[in-house]
Design a protein with these regions (language model features):
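Conserved GNAT acetyl-CoA-binding A-motif
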Residues: 121-130
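Conserved catalytic-core motifs of GNAT/GCN5-like acyltransferases
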Residues: 129, 147-163
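A conserved beta-turn-beta hairpin within the catalytic core of GNAT-like acetyltransferases
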Residues: 84-93, 103, 107, 124
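Conserved beta-strand in the GNAT
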Residues: 66, 74-83, 92
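A short, well-structured alpha-helix characteristic of acyl/acetyltransferase catalytic modules
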Residues: 1-53, 164, 172-195
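Conserved acetyl-CoA-binding loop-helix of GNAT-fold acetyltransferases
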Residues: 104-118, 139, 143
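Conserved active-site alpha-helix within GNAT-family acetyltransferase domains
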Residues: 134-150
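A short, internal acetyl-CoA/4′-phosphopantetheine-binding micro-motif in the GNAT/acyltransferase core
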Residues: 68, 94-106, 131
Length: 195
């Protein structure tokens, strides 16, 4: 089975589903908060025209997900799988934002756990690109066990390039840290990391 960039994923806390064009209004209702974007390279993404550009890029990516609360259906935010490299056995997770009321708790960990467990059924490494000055997201990556492997300029869809720190989490390290050892049911574990 090939890697699905837009899976439907569910936990007790969260429901992730492919982002649809008619999700714009509900997602912008979260994204219009300027404080969500204050450490992001594009701090104007709370503005509707700027967010429309982000949303268009998300739709064209083929990997964007809408995040909702499993119990209530409340819109929480969005994230994305992108840059799948089957030869290298890697995929990236990013473009994530969450409503502020979900910051500082277990939501980001629950989200990344769902996405990492899906990814590690197919690839050996997950990459994250984080804005160099986004200390909140960089702290979250440290807590998640991400290892810095470099820096690179990233030009988000229709935006100017900015320096991003590249983090990696390898399947073996994740499984050791979380106590998991098997690929999701019915999936090949894929190539093992040699790094």
């Amino acid at each position: 089975m090939p890697f699905q960039l837009q899976p439907t994923l569910q936990s007790a806390r969260l429901h992730l589903a492919p982002l649809r064009a008619d999700d714009f209004a509900r997602l912008y209702a979260v994204a219009c908060d300027p404080l969500i974007w204050e450490q992001h390279p594009n701090q104007n993404r709370y503005q509707e025209a700027v967010f429309r550009n982000y949303f268009q890029g998300a739709m064209e990516s083929g990997g964007a997900l809408l995040i909702t609360a499993a119990s209530s259906g409340e819109t929480i935010g969005s994230s994305r799988f992108y840059d799948l490299d089957e030869t290298a056995g890697s995929v990236a997770i990013g473009y994530t934002f969450l409503a502020r009321k979900y910051w500082g708790g277990a939501t980001n960990l629950a989200l990344k756990t769902l996405m990492l467990e899906h990814a590690f059924g197919f690839v050996a490494r997950v990459i994250f690109h984080v804005g160099e000055h986004n200390t909140r997201s960089r702290t979250a990556m440290d807590r998640l066990g991400g290892i810095i492997i470099g820096k690179t300029p990233i030009a988000y869809y229709g935006e100017a390039a900015s320096t991003n720190v590249i983090y990696a989490i390898d399947r073996d390290a994740w499984q050791a840290a979380t106590g998991t050892s098997a690929a999701p049911s019915g999936r090949s574990p894929g190539p093992r990391s040699t790094n």
